[in-house]
Amino acid sequence: MRASITASSGQDPRFGDLHEALVDAMALAGVPAEVSVDCFAAAGDGLVHVLVPGAYLPHVHPAAYPSADQLRRTLLVVTESPGAPGFDRSAALAETAAATFVLDPGAVPELARKGIRARLLPLGHVPAWDIWGGAESERPIDLAVLGDFSDRRARAVALAGPALAGRRAALHLVRKPLTPATAAATPSGAAKRELLANARVLLLVHEREGRSFDWLEALPAIANGAVIQSEQPSDHGPLVAGRHFECAGFYALSTALEGLLASPDRLERVRSEAYDFIRAERPLSAVGAALREAIDSTSAAAGHASGARGRLTVPMPLQAEGPTPAVERLQEHPSEGDVVRAALKQALVRQRRLERELRRLDADGDGAGPDDRVVEIGSSDAPQPRVSVVVTLYNYANTIAGALRSVGLSDLDEVEVVLVDDASTDDSLAVARAALEEMSWLPGRIVERGANGGLPAARNAGIAHARADYVFVLDADNVVHPGGLRLLADALDREPGADFAYGVIRQVGPAGPMGLLSWAPWDPWWLRIDNYIDAMAMLRRSSVEVVGGYTSDEAFMGWEDFELWCNMASHGMSGEFVPELVADYRTGHISMLSLTTLDTTDGWTALFDRYEFLREPA
């Protein structure tokens, strides 16, 4: 008697952890187990298959799906909850499978309504997952967030911003498909367990509107002492809310999280009770016993010489489907709306070009424009800064003071501000001066441009006047968090080979937090799809100088930061991702974003013409 777990080379790393637990459980029950990748193992005497449908079916060719004969010798472990994508597909397999186990208690009655008998797999404490051991330990990470990215999860993290003020976080939301670079940057296996053993709280948010409990995230967290703060789940037995984990409604999560993080005694109580419970009531031997019973029954029913036939027993992995690359989207026939948006964008570009030229002529009759005027601010004997914050300004009188004050409130001492006023026509410069005068401790300079040259030229001027090796780019309508500059500078210190560093940014609208930007690790592969990194990043000045700074080519108007990331990628440069909230991006006003998103055809065309790697198959 032996078992073969059918896995996929393209599966989510969480399923690798589950397979490891199943192998260990069967070993405790005296059943040797192997793992077959991307196909079912060849039939043999006493062989029983174990299949987690969600780990296998999405990642292999249909020819590698189990046949009816194979299913009759297969134990299913269904990880999906009722209503979740993939649940009905797993249920269809369960109609023929020898036995079906589920992780979600709510799946048992749902499958029963379909005439399928399913048993709850008593998964709990897995020794291989537990690197903590229950001993007292320092936990430097206040909050960890793991799992696939969804707009809902992103908004929950954005809403939790106040609870994270002054605290450390590890925000790892995964973008699918899982590319090699993304997989390498995503905590899994031993790295994930180490993260959980160093985290005080793990935040669980339903990916969609369903209320299923995420067992594959919760159990490794409990095994390593990370307390679960979950959105209100439906079926979570045998765990008890308030004893083994904490829960709250979606819009109450931030308040609940803040209260939990501020209560060390409560954290310790929940941590201990949850850990002791899964060790005592859900040992891995119980999983082994349940699987052994099902394996014995399956072997007896099939007979030792079943010769069960299946499909081809050769690996047949399937390349994961991802978003359509921009080069393919561009080849699609444009709609009437696309044509109108493209024409409107061209009109706006021409209008801005004309306005800029008129301002130049107004400033100087011959159109050349006066030179920039530089005014030093703050202490004249300020030490060499570690970070220069370049703030570009053009007619943002209502928001510039907030942006500058956020720099002054940074917990990094060695910082200067370089304010570049791009010939504002309102009282933006006066407001900025007043804000800087209130912060005498903040050194730097004001660069007053004689004529408006546009955003990329203003940023390049700021970088040219910066004294620090690290330059953070801040627009006049955004704010940097108190710890943001320090986190990014520390990242560049740790990774001398990185050319820039960026962190997670909250997107905030008039009604409050909306979602996240810059939440994915550096991977040039994704530049074929979209610009996923905001301009608010910390640049190594020497690297920016190598690529020539921000382009002033009007073909990239509104896309200057995207062009910079593509330029750096084409030079083999890289960015260091910091999985913490570092800044707020404000929306709901007229901004360069409106021009960027109005029409994308011209921008993509210019990028494809300049950077060959963007045209390569994604």
Question: Each predicted region: which residue ranges?
Answer:
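Extended catalytic core of nucleotide-activated donor transferases of GT-like folds
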Residues: 2-116, 127-130, 238, 426
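Catalytic binding pocket for nucleotide-activated donors in carbohydrate/polymer assembly enzymes
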Residues: 3-7, 20-21, 26-27, 31, ...
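N-proximal low-complexity "stem/linker" segments adjacent to membrane-targeting elements
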Residues: 342-406
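Short, acidic, metal-binding catalytic loop of nucleotide-sugar glycosyltransferases
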Residues: 405-414
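Glycine-rich, basic loop-to-helix element that forms the pyrophosphate-binding segment
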Residues: 449-466
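Short aromatic/hydrophobic "clamp" motif used to bind/position activated sugar donors
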Residues: 471
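Conserved donor NDP-sugar-binding/catalytic core segment of glycosyltransferases
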Residues: 483-515
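Conserved nucleotide-sugar donor-binding catalytic segment
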Residues: 524-605
